[in-house]
């Protein structure tokens, strides 16, 4: 069975594993998922990620991050642009997540960027997800 929205599946698996206090999550690999994982690592929401060869294709393994008393670093994730309703934003109208405390992941012509990076570069694009 084909998957309609692999990005939503990726974000849902991260959220569920984080809620259940898992140490890592294994997911099917794709370039866009690896780019999202790189942004989450750079912003401090996950500890690390790596790819491994599986029997069929590759596997993306995401190591989740928790605080000293097991508080979650990933409080929430929301998919914004979906296959049935695409959401785009101009560089002058980029969303702020929780007043700047969270991150919006934007797919631009220069690759995946956070809302702050896209504003600095003056590019807009498709708003993929909010992370806080």
UniProtKB/Swiss-Prot annotation:
GO terms for molecular function: rRNA binding; structural constituent of ribosome. One of its GO terms (cellular component) is ribosome. One of its GO terms (biological process) is translation. Disulfide bonds: none annotated. It comes from the Bacteria. Keywords: Ribonucleoprotein, Ribosomal protein, RNA-binding, rRNA-binding. Coiled coil: none annotated. Part of the 30S ribosomal subunit. Contacts proteins S5 and S12. One of the primary rRNA binding proteins, it binds directly to 16S rRNA central domain where it helps coordinate assembly of the platform of the 30S subunit. PANTHER family: 40S RIBOSOMAL PROTEIN S15A. Belongs to the universal ribosomal protein uS8 family. HAMAP family: Ribosomal_uS8_B. This is Small ribosomal subunit protein uS8.
């Amino acid at each position: 069975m084909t998957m309609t929205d692999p990005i939503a599946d990726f974000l849902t698996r991260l959220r569920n594993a984080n809620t259940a206090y898992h140490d890592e999550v294994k997911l099917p690999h794709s370039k866009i998922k690896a780019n999202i994982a790189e942004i989450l690592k750079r912003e401090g929401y996950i500890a690390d990620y790596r790819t491994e060869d599986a029997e069929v294709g590759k596997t993306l393994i995401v190591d989740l991050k928790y605080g000293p008393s097991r508080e979650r670093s990933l409080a929430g994730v929301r998919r914004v642009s979906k296959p049935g309703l695409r959401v785009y934003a101009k560089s002058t109208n980029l969303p702020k997540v929780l007043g700047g405390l969270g991150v919006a992941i934007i797919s631009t012509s220069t690759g995946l960027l956070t809302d702050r990076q896209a504003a600095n570069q003056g590019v807009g694009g498709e708003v993929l997800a909010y992370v806080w």
